[in-house]
């Protein structure tokens, strides 16, 4: 079975390393299976990097089953438009598209780990603001709201959410309103939005500490968590 592990794409070297590590962990998990299926994991992107998901899907054998799995945290334009277009145009006889990685309680626990690394403790008690890229689609925004609810459950404290893109509620406006000591980063890896989130937090003039993205190449365990979510989505 061909598995198209499809991420957004980034110019960030650190971000690329993190996504590559996720794919490595996916391969490791699939190699451990005893179901008699040969899984071949291929890289693909919806933006910035190559090969595009359209080109990657078109290059696969038409008579072999394929699943496109988004390495994306939420439903959105990419999952509902880009991936579906690639699947239709591929000519592959048996092709399906998996759901996005989140929302998922495992990702919320990983976000808590990143907050703890930034200095957050349960005794802190104050509101946390979670920043996410944002989506033009209502279902994508609902996913991000649910992700904030899951983080609130993982932390045992109030979590507000805001979007880094020009979509309401905007992250910097939520930070300015709630004045959190810590901000959680609901992004998979370093890249454009992670940098903008830090700049937006700084622009408020408030001392909010911004946690790192969920995965980095120096922490294979974080990539393993995401890979487990990936395989679960693939199996659904």
Question: Over which residues does each language-model region extend?
Answer:
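Active-site-proximal alpha-helix that buttresses catalytic centers in soluble enzyme cores
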Residues: 1-236
